[in-house]
């Protein structure tokens, strides 16, 4: 990226084009990919090829990483290493997360 992208508000992110259950691209720069997911898939996700961070923007639910489950809500920061089984469960209608994939594919 040859410039700094403008700030993206939650309202703007909610308006990004996406398909149901999938995240929308916010921006990509080298080994960093920022996405936004409103109502992500409820249940297991396919393990990803890169480490990732989730930042809960709105709503509530449960976050499972392998066999550990945590209640999550706005402001929570969640980590998942590449190739690890994870997913969201029992998410509210307004649940949304910022998703940051970073580092090389593993």
Residue map of PLM features:
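Short strand-coil-strand connectors
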Residues: 30, 64-68, 91
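Short acidic-glycine-tyrosine-enriched beta hairpin
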Residues: 67-82
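Ligand-binding loop in jelly-roll beta-barrel domains
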Residues: 82-106
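Short secondary-structure boundary/capping segments
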Residues: 24-26, 45-46, 53, 69-70, ...
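Short, conserved beta-strand element in jelly-roll/cupin
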Residues: 48-63
């Amino acid at each position: 990226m040859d410039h700094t992208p403008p700030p993206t508000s939650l309202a703007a992110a909610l308006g990004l084009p996406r398909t149901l259950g999938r995240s929308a691209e916010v921006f990509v720069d080298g080994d960093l990919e920022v996405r936004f997911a409103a109502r992500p898939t409820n249940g297991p996700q396919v393990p990803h090829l890169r480490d990732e961070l989730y930042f809960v923007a709105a709503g509530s639910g449960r976050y499972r990483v392998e066999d550990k489950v945590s209640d999550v809500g706005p402001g929570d920061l969640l980590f998942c290493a590449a190739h690890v089984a994870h997913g969201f469960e029992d998410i509210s209608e307004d649940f949304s997360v910022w998703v940051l994939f970073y580092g090389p594919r593993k």
